[in-house]
């Protein structure tokens, strides 16, 4: 094992030693399903390796009575997993990419971004409102979401609705919707509902024209120790080139804006005919003030290649030496350019006011 010298262990099976890779994950059912998906891909690629899943709770899992945007910490769903990586208790961890900050702590990197599923949001309705849409819900209906991004966009579009914070994992939120008479509907990520096998609960899909999605939404990320070359090589084959380039652009946009979950920032990316289109927007908390722009860059979706030099620096926390560097840099530059355009037009004022108001709410 190269890198920091620790990582994988071995196990006896049929008298022969098998290498064991320890995979860290959050404890929620959705997190376990996502991790099982990644492990299944790795097992198919490396049948001679055994994978052991180690589940743990994160700060975001434990603090359930406060909106995420109010907790005031960036690595809400990743810090404990990174601590386990640092202590060599696990060899890699699986995250929802949207939970991973655009700047990682020293010593860590995203070694793989898997093929993105539907990045859009969905509305799940209380049984008595099945067949409705957000537009046709009764006046002052309560819609549950813990996302400032969703509230800012949807409040502007559907002023007759009231948006209320709802926390907990998907199971908890659906139970609150169905059993309490508090919510007429809740807004969740399509990808999460699909992974849980709950597609039948999707009452309305919010397309980007109605509600742009979070940076990285719908994609899974594999985080590893940056110097653990062996594990980096092992997981890098999971990189999906199109997803990678879209997410580099999105993360570069967010990082350059200095955004996070405490301000409403949203994106939409499309790769078509050798062009990467990035739409990004910022909103005031109530959605009354907003700014959106679209830019594009010429980027062909590359096939994976032989690994480039080992000393290539990360881009927005991601290492992908098997994807052409030029394409990655073009995607990063697109995100930076779009953020710069918005900042030059006054987006910083919108974001600063949103942060201040969020702090005092």
UniProtKB/Swiss-Prot annotation:
Family: Belongs to the HMBS family.
SUPFAM superfamilies tied to this protein: Periplasmic binding protein-like II, Porphobilinogen deaminase (hydroxymethylbilane synthase), C-terminal domain
Name of the protein described by the UniProt record: Porphobilinogen deaminase
Cofactor remark from the record: Binds 1 dipyrromethane group covalently.
Protein localization: Cytoplasm, Cytosol
UniProt keyword list: Acetylation, Cytoplasm, Heme biosynthesis, Phosphoprotein, Porphyrin biosynthesis, Transferase
Gene3D superfamilies the record matches: Periplasmic binding protein-like II (3.40.190.10), Porphobilinogen deaminase, C-terminal domain (3.30.160.40)
Cofactor: dipyrromethane
């Amino acid at each position: 094992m190269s890198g920091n010298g620790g990582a994988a262990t071995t196990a006896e099976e049929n008298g022969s030693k098998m290498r064991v890779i320890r995979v860290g994950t959050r404890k929620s059912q959705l997190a376990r399903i996502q991790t099982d998906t990644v492990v299944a891909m790795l097992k198919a690629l490396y049948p001679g390796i055994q994978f052991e899943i180690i589940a743990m709770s994160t700060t975001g899992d434990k603090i359930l009575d406060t909106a995420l945007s109010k907790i005031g910490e960036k690595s809400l769903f990743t810090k404990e997993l990174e601590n386990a990586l640092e202590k060599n208790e696990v060899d890699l961890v699986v995250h929802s990419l949207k939970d991973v900050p655009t700047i990682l702590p020293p010593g860590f990197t995203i070694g793989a971004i898997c093929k993105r599923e539907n990045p859009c949001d969905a509305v799940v309705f209380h049984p008595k409102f099945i067949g409705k849409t957000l537009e046709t819900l009764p006046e002052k209906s309560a819609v549950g979401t813990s996302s400032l991004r969703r509230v800012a966009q949807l409040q502007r579009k559907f002023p007759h609705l009231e948006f209320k914070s709802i926390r907990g994992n998907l199971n908890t939120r659906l139970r609150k919707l169905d059993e309490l008479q508090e919510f007429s509907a809740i807004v969740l990520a399509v990808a999460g509902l699909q992974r849980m096998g709950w597609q039948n609960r999707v009452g309305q899909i919010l397309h980007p024209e109605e509600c742009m999605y979070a940076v990285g939404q719908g994609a899974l990320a594999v985080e590893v120790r940056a110097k653990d070359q062996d594990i980096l090589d092992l997981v890098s084959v999971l990189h999906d080139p199109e997803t990678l380039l879209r997410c580099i652009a999105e993360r570069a946009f967010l990082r350059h804006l200095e955004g996070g979950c405490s301000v409403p920032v949203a994106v939409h990316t499309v790769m078509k005919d050798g062009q990467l289109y990035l739409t990004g927007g910022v909103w005031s908390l109530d959605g009354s003030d907003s700014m959106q722009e679209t830019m594009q860059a010429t980027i062909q979706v590359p096939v994976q290649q032989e690994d480039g030099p080992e000393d290539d620096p990360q881009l927005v926390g991601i290492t992908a030496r098997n994807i052409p560097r030029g394409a990655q840099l073009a995607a990063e530059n697109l995100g930076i350019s779009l953020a710069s355009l918005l900042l030059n037009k006054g987006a910083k004022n919108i974001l600063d006011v949103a942060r201040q108001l969020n702090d005092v709410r």
